[in-house]
Amino acid sequence: PFWHMMTCAAIVLTALSFILGRDIWKQKWQGRKGGTKYIVGQIVLGIALAFVLWGVFWVGDKLSQWVFPSFARMQVNSIYSIKDGFDPHVVGLLLLLLIGPAEEIFWRGYVQERLQRSCSKTWIGALIGIALYTAIHIPSCNFMLIVAAGVCGVVWGGLYWWKPQWFPALLLSHAVWDAAVFVWFPI
């Protein structure tokens, strides 16, 4: 089933990110000061960003239904059907505590960081990372999901490129947004 596959993928990709990116993670956390002000700021920023993104998607849903009346809703409903037959509490916890953080650790913390380090200009690495994050959703053949991944990729990837020290907030944002849009407040 889908949720078993996502759980396994999250665990494997997180482990690979830490194993293959030891140098990245060591450098990223070396000498970091994590005082209360920093931690509270990251939490507030992460939650606020998640709900701003939720609002963007709410508006996007209304616009897409206006532009593509039956197509958009059918595509969105097929995404939401993935949770059918599963306890929504379990799905929410998986998204919040494992899958969302794992995706951010892999895509921004490892893939995008590695690309930014290997390209002559960091913004080129960021764009490639965003494109890869979007492209990985193409096999779903779900246009709305691909667009959603592109929007989130631009936001999280762009912010990571601009302010890499916001990584904890981006990780929290991804986790909260996943649970909010998919379980707590479906659009």
Question: Which residue stretches match the model-derived regions?
Answer:
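Juxtamembrane/transmembrane-helix boundary motifs at the membrane-water interface
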Residues: 1-5, 68, 183-187
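Alpha-helical transmembrane segments in multi-pass membrane proteins
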Residues: 1-27
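Alpha-helical and His/Cys-centered functional microenvironments
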Residues: 8, 26, 46, 141, ...
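Alpha-helical transmembrane segments of multipass membrane proteins
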Residues: 11-13, 49-57, 152, 177, ...
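Alpha-helical transmembrane segments of polytopic integral membrane proteins
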Residues: 17, 21-22, 56-60, 103-104, ...
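Transmembrane helix-loop junctions in multipass membrane proteins, especially transporters and channels
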Residues: 21-26, 62-70, 138-142, 165, ...
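Juxtamembrane helix-loop-helix connectors linking adjacent transmembrane helices
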Residues: 26-99, 117
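Transmembrane helix-loop-helix hairpins at the membrane interface
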Residues: 84-187
